[in-house]
C-alpha cells in the first residue's frame, strides 16, 4: 500500500518541479524579452526622402519652356514687388528675374541671391546682384518628391490615438479583438472559439490572436507559422501588456498594421490607408470606408480594393454586418452602407505624380547594394518634375484622343496602354518616366519591365552598322548615298522561305539609304542586313545599351522582331544623339544617410559605342525622317532646327513607337495593349502625336544644330544614282559622308559634267 502512495508522491513532486522549472524558464525568458521589446514611437522611424534633380540656372533658358516660374512656386518661393530681402523671395520684371535662393545644406551651399538678366523671356546672363559678376553652376534646390519608410519601403502616417475617430477604433476592435480591454494579451475565450470552429470546419478558418499578439508578431517576429514562433509571440504579448497601457498598444497597432501595397511600397497604418485608398483624412471617412480598411487587416493583398474590388466588397460587408450585430450600426445605416459600391479615389500627391519613377528609383538603389533601405535615407534622383508632369499629361491626353478617333480601341476588355521615357543623352539621367496609363489600376512598369518588338526602330542601327563598316573598310559597307534595291526577294530561313514586304505593299526600285530610311522601307533594310551579316548589328545594339537578347535572324535584326524595353531603345537612340557615346540610364544620383553622409554615388557608365562620325551621319538621316519621311507631321508643332527621330510599327500592328531627339534630350514613346492584341495603328498614327505634344512642351522652338565632328565631308549627289552630281543632273542634293567613304564617280546616267570631272581629276576647288 505504501509503495503506490510513495510513487504517486514522487511523481507529483517531479511534475511540480518540472512545472516550476518551466515556469522559471518562461519568467526568465519573459524578463529577457522585457529588456528589449519596445513599442515604436512616432519619431523613431524617420522616412526615406526622395528628391528630384537640381535645376541649372544658365544662359539661353526660356522662361516659358523651362517652366522656371512654376518651379519657383512648387519650391515655395514668394513673388515680391520690392527688392528681395529674404531667402524664398523672387522679383520679376521685363528685364530681370532676381531670386534669393534657399540654402542647400546637402550641397554645403548657403542662401544666395542671383539675378537672371532677360531679353524677351530668354536668359542672357546669370549674375550676382551685389556686384554684377557672372555666376556659374547655380542650381535651384531639388524638390521633395516622396517620403517613404526604409527597410520595407513603407508609407506610414503616425496618428496619436486621441486623434483617431472612435468609429475607427470600435470597428477595428469589433472585427479583430472584441475582448481587447478585458484580456491580458492572450484571450483564452477567443483561442477556444477558434479551435472549435476550426475543428468543426475541418481546417484553419479562424484565428484566435489578440491585437497585442498581432502587434508582437508584426514588430518582432517572422510570419512563419510554427509552434515555437506562436509561443514567443504569446509571451511577447504578455510582456507588452505588462510594460504598456492598452492605449499605447492600440495606438501602435493602428499605426503599424500592414494594409496593402502602392506598387513596390508598403502601406502601414489606418491613416496612411485612408490617404492612399480614399484620398481622405480619418475624420473624412464614411462608415463603409472605415469597414473597408478594417476588413483589410485579415488579408491586405487579397482584399485590396484597387486590385480585387469584389472580394474587397464582400469582406467590407462582413465587417458591416458585424457592426450591425453588435449594435454599432443601426439597421438603416447598415442597409445604406452595404449598398454603396466600392469607390477607390487615391490621393493625387507627389507619389502619384511619378509613381513608376519612384518604383524604378527604389529598384536601382537596391541593385546598387543599399539593402535594406536605411531609415532616414535621402535619395537624390534625376527626375525633372516639370518634364515628368508634362510627360504624364501628354500620355493621358494622347491616349484619350486615340480612343476618340479610333473607337475600336475602346471595345477591348483592357484599355490601350502607353509609356514614355525622357533621357538626357549626355548624362544618362532619367528626366521623366511614365510606365502606364494609370498606376492605381496597374503597377506594371511598361517603360522598363515590358519587352515588346520595336519593329522599324531597329532599321537605323542596320544602316549605322553599315556606315561603321564603310569607315573601317570592311565588307558590307554602305554610305548615305548607296543605292539599295527595293524589289521582291526571297530568303531561306529555319522555318522556310520568307519574302519581306513594305508597308505600302509596293516596291520602289533602287533607292538611296537616306530615302529607304526616311520612308521606312523594309526590303532595303533586310537586304542591307543580309549583305553586312547580322552579327555586327547585334553587337552594335548591345554596345548602344540594349541588354535584351536579340535573335540573329534577318527578321529579328532588320525588322525588329526581337523584344526590347522602351528604356533600352530610347537609351540606344540617346547614344546616337550623344555622338556615339552610350551612357547607361540612371534614375539616382546619390544616397545619403540621416546624418547627410554619402552612402553611394552614381558613377556614369559610359562607352564610345560607335564613332562620332557614324553617329552624325545617322542623325542626319534621321533628321530627314522628320523633314520628309514617316514623321514629317512632327514639324507641325513649330520646332525649328535639328530634330531627329524614327517611327516604329511591328508586324501585325501590335506596337506603335516613336523615338525622337535633339542634342539635349531624347524622348521615347510606346503605345499598345498589354495582351499584345493588334493596335491596328502605325507608330506615326499612335505614338508620334504623343511625342509631338510632349516635345512641344519641353523642347524650345529653336533647336541648335547637332555638332559636326571632324572627319565629315559634304558632297552634292544625284539621288537617282547615288553618284556625284553633274550640271546635267535634274535633281541634286547635298549629302554627308564619313571622310574617305564619299563617292568619287560622277553621274554616269545624265552625262555632261565635263568641267566637274576636270576639277576632280586635277584637284581644282
Would you name each region that the model predicts?
Residues 381-411, 417-424, 433-434, 438-444, ...:
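A penicillin-recognizing enzyme superfamily signal
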Residues 197-225, 280-283, 347-353, 357, ...:
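Conserved catalytic neighborhood of penicillin-recognizing serine enzymes
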Residues 1-404, 429-431, 487, 527, ...:
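Juxtamembrane regions of bacterial inner-membrane/periplasmic proteins
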Residues 77-78, 164-167, 176-187, 200-205, ...:
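Bacterial peptidoglycan biogenesis and beta-lactam-recognition machinery
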Residues 72, 172, 215, 249, ...:
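Conserved structural-core and active-site-/substrate-pathway-adjacent residues in large, well-folded domains
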Amino acid at each position: 500500500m505504501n509503495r503506490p502512495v510513495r510513487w504517486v508522491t514522487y511523481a507529483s513532486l517531479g511534475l511540480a518541479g518540472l512545472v516550476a522549472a518551466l515556469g522559471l524558464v518562461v519568467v526568465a525568458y519573459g524578463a529577457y524579452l522585457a529588456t528589449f521589446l519596445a513599442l515604436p514611437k512616432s519619431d523613431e522611424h524617420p522616412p526615406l526622402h526622395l528628391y528630384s534633380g537640381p535645376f541649372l540656372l544658365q544662359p539661353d533658358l526660356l522662361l516659358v519652356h523651362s517652366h522656371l516660374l512654376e518651379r519657383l512656386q512648387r519650391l515655395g518661393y514668394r513673388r515680391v514687388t520690392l527688392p528681395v530681402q529674404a531667402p524664398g523671395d523672387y522679383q520679376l520684371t521685363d528685364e530681370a528675374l532676381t531670386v534669393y535662393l534657399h540654402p542647400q545644406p546637402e550641397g554645403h551651399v548657403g542662401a544666395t541671391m542671383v539675378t537672371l538678366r532677360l531679353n524677351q523671356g530668354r536668359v542672357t546672363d546669370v549674375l550676382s546682384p551685389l556686384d554684377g559678376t557672372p555666376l556659374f553652376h547655380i542650381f535651384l534646390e531639388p524638390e521633395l518628391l516622396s517620403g517613404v519608410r526604409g527597410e520595407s519601403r513603407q508609407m506610414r502616417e503616425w496618428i496619436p490615438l486621441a486623434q483617431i475617430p472612435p468609429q475607427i477604433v470600435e470597428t477595428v476592435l469589433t472585427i479583430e479583438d472584441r475582448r481587447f480591454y478585458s484580456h491580458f494579451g492572450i484571450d483564452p475565450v477567443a483561442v477556444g472559439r477558434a479551435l472549435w470552429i476550426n475543428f468543426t470546419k475541418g481546417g484553419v478558418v479562424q484565428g484566435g490572436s489578440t491585437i497585442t499578439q498581432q502587434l508582437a508578431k508584426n514588430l518582432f517576429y517572422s510570419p512563419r507559422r510554427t509552434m515555437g514562433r506562436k509561443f514567443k509571440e504569446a509571451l511577447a504579448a504578455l510582456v507588452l501588456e505588462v510594460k504598456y497601457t492598452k492605449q499605447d498598444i492600440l495606438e501602435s497597432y493602428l499605426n503599424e498594421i500592414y494594409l496593402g501595397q502602392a506598387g513596390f511600397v508598403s502601406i502601414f497604418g489606418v491613416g496612411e490607408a485612408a490617404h492612399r485608398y480614399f484620398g481622405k483624412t480619418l475624420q473624412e471617412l464614411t462608415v463603409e470606408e472605415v469597414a473597408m480598411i478594417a476588413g483589410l487587416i485579415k488579408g491586405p493583398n487579397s482584399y485590396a480594393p484597387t486590385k480585387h474590388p469584389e472580394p474587397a466588397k464582400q469582406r467590407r460587408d462582413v465587417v458591416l454586418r458585424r457592426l450591425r450585430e453588435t449594435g454599432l450600426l443601426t439597421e438603416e445605416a447598415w442597409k445604406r452602407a452595404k449598398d454603396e459600391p466600392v469607390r477607390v479615389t487615391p490621393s493625387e500627391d507627389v507619389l502619384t505624380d511619378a509613381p513608376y519613377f519612384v518604383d524604378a528609383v527604389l529598384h536601382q538603389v537596391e541593385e546598387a547594394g543599399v539593402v535594406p533601405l536605411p531609415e532616414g535615407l535621402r535619395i537624390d534622383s534625376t527626375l525633372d518634375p516639370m518634364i515628368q508632369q508634362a510627360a504624364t499629361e501628354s500620355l493621358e491626353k494622347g491616349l484619350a484622343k486615340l480612343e476618340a478617333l479610333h473607337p475600336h480601341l475602346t471595345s477591348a476588355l483592357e484599355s490601350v496602354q502607353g509609356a514614355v521615357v525622357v533621357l538626357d543623352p549626355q548624362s544618362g539621367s532619367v528626366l521623366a518616366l511614365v510606365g502606364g496609363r494609370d498606376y492605381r489600376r496597374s503597377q506594371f512598369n511598361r517603360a522598363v519591365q515590358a519587352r515588346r518588338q520595336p519593329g522599324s526602330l531597329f532599321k537605323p542601327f542596320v544602316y549605322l552598322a553599315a556606315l561603321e563598316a564603310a569607315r573601317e573598310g570592311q565588307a558590307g559597307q554602305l554610305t548615305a548615298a548607296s543605292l539599295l534595291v527595293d524589289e521582291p526577294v526571297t530568303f531561306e530561313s529555319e522555318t522556310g522561305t520568307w519574302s519581306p514586304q513594305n508597308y505600302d505593299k509596293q516596291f520602289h526600285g533602287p533607292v538611296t539609304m537616306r530615302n529607304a530610311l526616311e520612308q521606312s522601307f523594309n526590303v532595303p533594310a533586310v537586304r542591307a542586313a543580309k549583305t553586312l551579316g547580322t552579327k555586327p548589328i547585334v553587337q552594335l545594339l548591345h554596345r548602344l545599351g540594349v541588354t535584351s537578347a536579340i535573335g540573329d535572324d534577318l527578321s529579328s535584326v532588320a525588322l525588329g522582331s526581337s523584344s526590347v524595353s522602351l528604356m533600352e531603345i530610347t537609351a540606344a537612340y540617346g547614344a546616337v544623339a550623344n555622338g556615339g557615346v552610350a551612357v547607361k540610364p540612371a534614375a539616382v544620383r546619390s544616397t545619403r544617410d540621416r546624418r547627410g553622409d554619402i552612402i553611394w554615388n552614381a558613377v556614369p557608365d559610359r562607352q564610345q559605342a560607335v564613332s562620332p562620325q557614324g553617329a552624325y551621319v545617322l542623325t542626319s538621316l534621321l533628321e530627314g525622317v522628320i523633314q520628309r519621311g514617316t514623321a514629317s507631321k512632327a514639324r507641325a508643332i513649330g520646332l525649328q532646327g535639328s530634330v531627329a527621330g524614327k517611327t516604329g510599327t511591328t508586324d501585325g500592328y501590335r506596337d506603335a513607337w516613336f523615338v525622337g531627339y535633339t542634342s539635349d534630350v531624347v524622348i521615347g514613346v510606346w503605345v499598345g495593349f498589354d495582351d499584345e492584341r493588334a493596335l491596328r495603328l502605325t507608330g506615326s498614327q499612335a505614338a508620334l502625336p504623343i511625342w509631338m505634344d510632349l516635345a512641344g512642351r519641353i523642347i524650345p522652338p529653336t533647336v541648335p544644330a547637332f555638332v559636326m565632328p571632324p572627319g565629315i565631308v559634304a558632297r552634292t549627289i544625284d539621288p537617282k544614282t547615288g553618284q556625284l552630281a553633274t550640271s546635267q543632273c535634274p535633281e541634286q542634293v547635298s549629302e554627308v559622308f564619313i571622310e574617305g567613304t564619299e563617292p568619287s564617280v560622277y553621274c554616269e546616267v545624265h552625262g555632261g559634267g565635263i568641267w566637274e570631272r576636270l576639277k576632280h581629276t586635277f584637284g581644282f576647288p
